[in-house]
Amino acid sequence: ALTQKPNSSIAVGFNYLKEGKIDAFASAGNTGAMLVGAMYSVKTIEGVIRPAISTLLPHSDERLGFLLDVGANADCKPEMLLQFGIMGALYARYLYKVEDPKVALLSIGEEAGKGNLLVQAAYPLFQECDKINFIGNVEGRDIFGDTADVIVTDGFTGNIVLKFGESIYDMIKK
């Protein structure tokens, strides 16, 4: 899409970012185009397999939490989830001043052995990582609570959570 539409706002925005004309770029445009633009125009940080999309989560204690990935990567490897956790913790720490952010994996149970094969494979990687404050698994009921500051999941699940949350808001405001 970026090569077919070089004058689109997304293509122009990423070119400006690459050339240093702007410091940041955000768009409400196509998610796939944003992912491709980020990976090929700006590149990922060395060692990062894939970027993730994050969303803010309102917490019950009026703070904000973070959920990632919410749609950039439907299929993930365990190492990608760990990188999302590290990036999310850095984001929470440096942009929102969360001291030692609590990082969790979204799963169907709090126990270490719970979850799909991806979550089960990622869990020990999170445990062994000294770059984050890993607190274990959280369940769907914890998403808007204050259990974790950063909740990590694959983009398929995260996008479902995001769209479900949007539908709850729409239902409540009617």
Question: PLM features: residue spans?
Answer:
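Short coil/turn connectors at secondary-structure junctions
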Residues: 19-23, 30-31, 48-50, 61-65, ...
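Short glycine-rich anion-binding loops that position phosphate/pyrophosphate groups of nucleotides
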Residues: 30-32, 110-111, 156-159
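Glycine-rich phosphate/diphosphate-binding loop of Rossmann-like nucleotide-binding domains
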Residues: 74-140, 149
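Short beta-strand segments
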Residues: 27-29, 56-57, 66-71, 106-107, ...
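Short acidic, glycine/serine/threonine-rich loops at helix termini
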Residues: 36-41, 79-80, 115-119, 162-165
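Short, charged beta->alpha transition segments
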Residues: 12-16, 50-58, 90-94
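N-terminal glycine-rich phosphate/adenylate-binding segment common to multiple enzyme folds
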Residues: 1-50
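Glycine-rich phosphate/nucleotide-binding loop
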Residues: 39-53, 59-63, 67, 146-174
